[in-house]
């Protein structure tokens, strides 16, 4: 067996061929390079201008067709599709449908703003071009409601309050039931009895709170802002009423409910209730 020719093997390796065909592989490589160069020449001639430095309107969308390379725009308000850039002045003009929809929405907003309040509220309200009602109308409505409640003569109410140093407490009660028909059909005897009952409750509450009048010495005390006497008359404790089932902060010596005027309050600290 003869040894292989080393020089022939080396020359075949240099030509990337083992059959001695010399230069076949090099020709294929040159063909591939030429085809790639030709393809790059074709792609260099295609450019697409996106104008991304200018923002589109909020209801427009910019799309690109991959097959044709065409850029088109879709208006999501009416579903139209166009190749004209909506950022230009001629294409950005609103369509008649959008103009009519916006005008109708503004009319509805103005109607809601005018219909929401009557009387003084309508006179004080101001409607802007966007259809919103100013805050002054809300204040007028609140003032009108307060005036109506203050001038309503069908109900009765009472209130009380007391303060001590830097501490204070207040309570109010309105005896109206809110039914206009029932209040208008009530007899004179029921109104007189209710007024007498309310006056008796008011006198009981006044007599109870009169014992809790702060003195000049205690009001001018330092520290926490109140002073406690020897008998504990100026100490606030939690108490519950058996009649109206409510809890109040009342003086320790008080025994009358500040709401209904009934006696026998359950002082939590005195009777040991938890």
UniProtKB/Swiss-Prot annotation:
Record's keyword annotation contains ATP-binding: yes
Transmembrane segments: none
Domain of life: Eukaryota
Keyword set, alphabetical order: ATP-binding, Helicase, Hydrolase, Nucleotide-binding
Low complexity composition-biased segments: 87-106, 121-133, 184-207
GO annotation, biological process: cuticle development
All copies of domain WW, residue ranges: 54-88
Cross-referenced Gene3D superfamilies: 2.20.70.10
InterPro entries given in the database record: WW_dom_sf, WWC/KIBRA_Hippo_Reg
Region (Disordered): 17-44, 83-133, 175-216
Placement of sequence motif EAR: 47-52
GO molecular function: ATP binding; helicase activity; hydrolase activity
Keyword Hydrolase: yes
PANTHER family: BOMB/KIRA PROTEINS, PROTEIN KIBRA
Physiological role: Negatively regulates the cuticle development probably by interacting with the HD-ZIP IV transcription factor HDG1.
Subunit structure: Binds to HDG1.
Protein name: Protein CURLY FLAG LEAF 1
Lineage: Eukaryota, Viridiplantae, Streptophyta, Embryophyta, Tracheophyta
GN (gene name): CFL1
């Amino acid at each position: 067996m003869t040894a292989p020719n080393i020089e022939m093997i080396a020359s075949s390796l240099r030509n990337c061929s083992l059959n001695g065909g010399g230069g076949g592989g090099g020709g294929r490589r040159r063909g591939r390079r030429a085809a790639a160069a030709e393809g790059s020449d074709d792609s260099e001639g295609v450019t697409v201008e996106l104008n991304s430095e200018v923002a589109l309107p909020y209801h427009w969308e910019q799309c690109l067709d991959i097959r044709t390379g065409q850029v088109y725009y879709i208006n999501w308000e009416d579903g139209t599709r166009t190749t004209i850039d909506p950022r230009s002045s001629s294409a950005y003009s609103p369509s008649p449908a959008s103009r009519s929809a916006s005008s109708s929405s503004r009319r509805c907003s103005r109607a809601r703003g005018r219909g929401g309040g009557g009387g003084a509220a309508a006179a004080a309200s101001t409607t802007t071009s966007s259809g919103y009602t100013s805050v002054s109308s809300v204040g007028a409505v609140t003032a009108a409601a307060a005036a109506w409640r203050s001038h309503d003569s069908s109900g009765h109410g009472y209130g009380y309050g007391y303060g001590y140093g830097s501490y204070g407490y207040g309570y109010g009660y309105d005896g109206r039931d809110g039914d206009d028909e029932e209040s208008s059909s009530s007899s004179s005897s029921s109104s007189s009895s209710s007024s007498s009952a309310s006056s008796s409750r008011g006198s009981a509450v006044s007599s109870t709170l009169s014992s809790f009048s702060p003195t000049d010495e205690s009001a001018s005390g330092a520290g926490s802002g109140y002073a406690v006497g020897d008998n504990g008359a100026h100490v606030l404790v939690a108490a519950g009423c058996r009649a109206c089932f409510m809890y109040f902060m009342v003086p320790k010596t008080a025994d009358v409910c500040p709401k209904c005027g009934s006696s026998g309050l359950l002082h939590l600290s005195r009777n040991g209730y938890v």
